[in-house]
């Protein structure tokens, strides 16, 4: 979801930079693409209505929201036999993002063993293919969500993430 209508949120505004009123855009619904972000120029070229995402450099999101799930973070942790909660990354999003390959360094995380937090981890590397992991390895999304810059995300549980230590 991209929503430029939310009050008092980073990147939300009543109008985009081309003067068109912002709205809530459903971009993907249950894994199916539903809409794309456009400005006046892009919309004209594609023969569609603008999505109210015009900026001086082309279309851009206002506030990206990954819709939350039903699980609580506490219940999600209890359901994990062995894993990590990642709170921070450094140098992340290297790899080939266009092909879905994402990797980076976990700067702050907590190790989970037997459904309990067992300690802190840092300076580990992670690697996923976002396309296949979110399609085939998504366990759950929490109902708790965190605002990070111009985005809001729940905690996401993924299976079979490659983690390396040094």
Residue ranges and their predicted role:
Residues 1-166:
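Dual-mode signal for accessory low-complexity, basic/Gly-rich regions
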């Amino acid at each position: 979801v991209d929503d430029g209508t939310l009050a008092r949120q980073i990147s939300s505004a009543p109008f985009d930079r081309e003067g068109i009123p912002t709205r809530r855009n459903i971009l993907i619904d249950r894994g199916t693409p539903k809409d794309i972000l456009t400005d006046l120029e892009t919309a004209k070229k594609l023969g569609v209505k603008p999505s109210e995402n015009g900026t001086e450099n082309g279309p851009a999101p206002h506030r990206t929201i990954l819709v939350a799930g039903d699980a609580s973070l506490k219940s999600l942790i209890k359901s994990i036999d062995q894993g990590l909660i990642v709170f921070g990354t450094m140098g992340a999003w290297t790899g080939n993002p266009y092909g879905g390959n994402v990797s980076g360094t976990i700067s702050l995380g907590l190790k989970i063993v037997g459904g309990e937090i067992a300690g802190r981890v840092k300076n580990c590397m992670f690697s996923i293919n976002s396309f296949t992991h979110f399609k085939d390895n998504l366990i759950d999304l929490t109902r708790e969500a965190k605002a990070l810059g111009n985005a809001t995300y729940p905690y996401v549980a993924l299976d079979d993430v490659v983690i390396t230590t040094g």
